[in-house]
Amino acid sequence: MRSSWIKPRLGKDNVTQMNFARNGYITEEMDFVAKKENLPSSLIMEEVARGRLIIPANINHLNLEPMSIGIASRCKVNANIGASPNASDINEEVEKLKLAVKYGADTVMDLSTGGVNLDEVRQAIIQESPVPIGTVPVYQALESVHGSIDRLTEDDFLHIIEKHCQQGVDYQTIHAGLLIEHLPKVKGRITGIVSRGGGILAQWMLHHFKQNPLYTRFDDICEIFKKYDCTFSLGDSLRPGCLHDASDDAQLAELKTLGELTRRAWEHNVQVMVEGPGHVPMDQIEFNVRKQMEECSEAPFYVLGPLVTDISPGYDHISSAIGAAMAGWYGTSMLCYVTPKEHLGLPNAEDVREGLIAYKIAAHAADIARHRAGARDRDDELSHARYNFDWNKQFELSLDPERAKQYHDETLPEEIFKKAEFCSMCGPKHCPMNSKISDESLDQLKDKLEECNTSV
């Protein structure tokens, strides 16, 4: 779809959506997004130019269907997939991708760390994906030197980052905000550093006693990104891994640096979103969102959860969806899903489904609470179908039609019950919607009550 759009841009020094927007040019991607979001193309261009909205769209990801992440657009959901040294199969990861897209993932991150050829699994995922693909390049940087921190050089990081860009990765988590002077602030935490990328860079800085190379070479990374229109997802290496550690000095020190880096990327006209926690008590979620907006000049916020309890292994998709709905309501632009396997193991296909649906609910609830135009239309349509006992329409409008039909059919599987004016909960005699009290009857009752001087 995008080949004809991209062709005139080839060979230019800066092909980012932000660069075009700041020069007053509405790209085909901006037009496409405007139609999807039911917003004016001019508004999309203005928000991209301002940095409040991003369109992750690498020029080498030709089968991408562009989408937007930002306060002006719908709240989005990311799904994580990826092979590990203990569980790895390229075909399985491609199937997870397809399942994630089927159940509404707006973007997908390939977090593969080993067990397969990382370039091959990434390429297979990009070739099959109509949604933006994100990666964490430091994983492959470490894998490229067989896990040996002492052999890992600054140039190794940049080489892998450019390789991901060349393959068509739309956004990369770059852990550039973690500085060597932040590390002592981790003392006193219960769970320390829980970011894999952050952990790698912390080890590198401690071993070499040098500043974070992703920070010192940040302008070089910007030069790479603007050649491909790859978007920064600035990683929060010091995100809290438990409620005790939330909103501490370490987290907020890194956030301040992420704000600095956001503005440095914008100087290169490179798109940015900023990653956030993590594990956060409900009463601190609004503070975290507001603080990010303040420090990072309203760049789109992308949060993992946050989980609002630490005692829900096996059900962390529920604990985190509560926090995600609140974060979305307060202005977070994208929610990274959490599956039931969080903290326990690598998710399988069913875990991907469970996590995604939980987060589609959270994002949708946030859009309704923020009064986005048309956000509640589908809910109202389903409610009409429910009142009219149109079971097939209810299934069709559900976030997970297969699951809705499955649960209904467990007790009333015959086709005749698709027209029945009851379900197995109340049965045919006790459903309150079965009585269908007419508006005319209610008007007559109101008139009679008024005649009796009864307040209504």
From Swiss-Prot:
Cofactor: binding comment: Binds 1 [4Fe-4S] cluster per subunit. The cluster is coordinated with 3 cysteines and an exchangeable S-adenosyl-L-methionine.
Domain of life: Bacteria
Record-listed substrate binding positions: 80, 109, 139, 175, 195-197, 236-239, 275, 302
Pathway(s) where this gene product acts: Cofactor biosynthesis; thiamine diphosphate biosynthesis
Catalytic activity field: 5-amino-1-(5-phospho-beta-D-ribosyl)imidazole + S-adenosyl-L-methionine = 4-amino-2-methyl-5-(phosphooxymethyl)pyrimidine + CO + 5'-deoxyadenosine + formate + L-methionine + 3 H(+)
Binding locations of [4Fe-4S] cluster: 423, 426, 431
Coiled coil, from the record: none
Keyword annotations of the record: 4Fe-4S, Iron, Iron-sulfur, Lyase, Metal-binding, S-adenosyl-L-methionine, Thiamine biosynthesis, Zinc
Keyword Calcium: no
Binding positions for Zn(2+) per the UniProt entry: 279, 343
GO BP terms, alphabetized: thiamine biosynthetic process; thiamine diphosphate biosynthetic process
GO molecular function term, any single one: 4 iron, 4 sulfur cluster binding
Pfam families: ThiC_Rad_SAM (PF01964)
Enzyme Commission numbers on file: 4.1.99.17
Task of the protein: Catalyzes the synthesis of the hydroxymethylpyrimidine phosphate (HMP-P) moiety of thiamine from aminoimidazole ribotide (AIR) in a radical S-adenosyl-L-methionine (SAM)-dependent reaction.
Family: Belongs to the ThiC family.
NCBIfam families from the UniProt entry: PRK09284.1, PRK13352.1, thiC
Name the record gives this protein: Phosphomethylpyrimidine synthase
Taxonomic lineage of the native organism: Bacteria, Bacillati, Cyanobacteriota, Cyanophyceae, Synechococcales
